[in-house]
From Swiss-Prot:
InterPro entries: Golgin-45, Hsk3-like
Residue window of motif Tankyrase-binding motif: 22-26
Modified residues annotated as Phosphoserine in this record: 53, 356
Residue runs in coiled coils: 126-263
Cellular component aspect of the GO annotation: Golgi apparatus; Golgi membrane; nucleus
Region (Disordered): 1-36
PTM comment: ADP-ribosylated by tankyrase TNKS and TNKS2. Poly-ADP-ribosylated protein is recognized by RNF146, followed by ubiquitination. Ubiquitinated by RNF146 when poly-ADP-ribosylated, leading to its degradation.
This protein's name: Golgin-45
Free-text note regarding domains: The tankyrase-binding motif (also named TBD) is required for interaction with tankyrase TNKS and TNKS2.
Keyword annotations of the record: ADP-ribosylation, Coiled coil, ER-Golgi transport, Golgi apparatus, Membrane, Phosphoprotein, Protein transport, Transport, Ubl conjugation
Oligomeric form and interacting partners: Interacts with GORASP2. Interacts with the GTP-bound form of RAB2, but not with other Golgi Rab proteins. Identified in a complex with RAB2 and GORASP2.
Organism listed in the record: Rattus norvegicus
Chain's role: Required for normal Golgi structure and for protein transport from the endoplasmic reticulum (ER) through the Golgi apparatus to the cell surface.
Length: 400
């Protein structure tokens, strides 16, 4: 009885301290594919009053169970721990049902029934369990260390990758993403600039059209002004010719007038001397005045002198009954006068129409029957007669 109670206590302890069954996905799977657990229905149930002896470590074929203990060197396999990131949504927990528990208990009881004949030492079993726990702790510690080392390696690798990326960007150029973003921004900027340039081009085309219209207008004005300038140039040339002709005509007239003036001055001197000689010994009826200032005064003076000489020589014969004589000669114009007439005719041909020359000679007074015949009468020949007169004689000499 004592032995049975000891076995019961160990069995209860063995059941409580038995390793839990591992499911799929905990990272400790065996490489063998999972096998279905077969439950033999022909096995007789174990009587509850017969307690099996404490069982030894028996290799189990159930999947997901970590087998610890002595392992031969031929069967050892090196496993590289690789960190696998599994999303939480992909992890499912498989909780064994009561039927599976019953099957596993039946399987263990069958094993215990088969090994009931072998009686082991409970201390040895306890020590084995402790060794298993220690190995599990050691394996967990090693796994944690491996995990920490792999984390450090991952961190170092991440830093190395970052540095390599920086070196690659520095050697190759900009970051492709940044380069793409920059190209996109430049494209948008170019689109905006293209639109602005399109608007400017439209405005410039309108301005160009307006300028072309203005150019046509100014071209027509220029052509018209050019025609007018040509006409004005021709008219200017004609006026210059006329001006030169008029200038030469005026110069000729002035030179002729100066010549006539000199001759009239000489005539005035001769008439004055003649009149003074005719009045010698008589009462002076004419006294020379100051020199005339102009040609008109000179002509007037000569005319008066001629009248005085005429009156002194011929008297007043035939003045009351003058007779007209037909014009025997036509007065011609001087070259300067002809040039002046030509210039006037060119300048104003309508006003300078040729008028009939009215160049009738002045009425010549022929001698008529007169009481006193003048000394220098054409019908008398007294030019060579000399009269001796004293200083006391006065008046005119009359030939009887």
């Amino acid at each position: 009885m004592e032995k049975m109670t000891t076995l019961k206590s160990f069995e209860s302890k063995g059941i409580l301290t038995s390793t839990p069954i591992r499911g799929a996905g905990d990272g400790m799977e065996t490489e063998e594919p999972p096998k279905s657990v077969e439950v033999t229905h022909g096995v007789q149930p174990i009587n509850q009053h017969v307690l099996p002896s404490p069982r030894k470590k028996v290799p189990s074929d159930s999947p997901g169970v970590l087998q610890l203990g002595k392992i031969l060197n031929e069967k050892t396999v090196e496993v590289e721990a690789v960190r696998i990131f599994v999303p939480k949504a992909a992890i499912t927990h498989d909780i064994p049902t009561k039927s599976a528990k019953v099957k596993s208990l039946g399987h263990h009881r069958e094993e215990l029934h088969n090994q009931s004949e072998v009686v082991t030492d409970p201390r040895k079993e306890l020590s084995e369990v402790k060794k298993v726990l220690e190995k599990l702790k050691n394996s967990e510690r090693r796994l944690l260390q491996d995990k920490e080392g792999l984390s450090n390696q991952l961190r170092v690798q991440t830093e190395v990758n970052r540095e390599l990326k920086k070196l690659l960007v520095a050697s190759v150029g900009d970051d492709p993403q940044y380069h793409f973003e920059r190209l996109a921004r430049e494209k948008n900027q170019l689109i905006l600039e293209n639109e602005a340039l399109g608007r400017n081009t439209a405005q410039l085309s309108e301005q160009l059209e307006r300028m072309s219209i203005q150019c046509d207008v100014w071209r027509s004005k220029f052509l018209a002004s050019r025609v007018m300038a040509d006409e004005l140039t021709n008219f200017r040339v004609v006026l210059q010719h006329q001006n030169r002709d008029a200038q030469s005509a005026i110069q000729d007239l002035l030179s002729e007038r100066e010549q006539f003036r000199q001759e009239m001055i000489s005539t005035q001197k001769f008439l004055e001397e003649l009149l003074v000689s005719l009045q010698w010994g008589r009462e002076q009826t004419y006294s020379p005045n100051t020199q005339p200032h102009s040609t008109a005064d000179l002509a007037l003076t000569n005319h008066r002198l001629a009248e005085a000489v005429h009156a002194h020589l011929l008297g007043n014969v035939g003045i009351s009954h003058p007779k007209r004589t037909p014009a025997t000669a036509e007065v011609c114009s001087t070259p300067a006068e002809k040039m002046a007439e030509k210039v006037l005719r060119i300048l104003d041909p309508v006003a300078c129409t040729e008028s009939s020359p009215d160049n009738a000679f002045a009425e010549s007074t022929l001698l008529t029957t007169k009481k006193n015949i003048g000394r220098f009468h054409p019908y008398t020949r007294y030019e060579n007669i000399t009269f001796n007169c004293c200083s006391h004689c006065q008046g005119e000499l009359l030939a009887l």
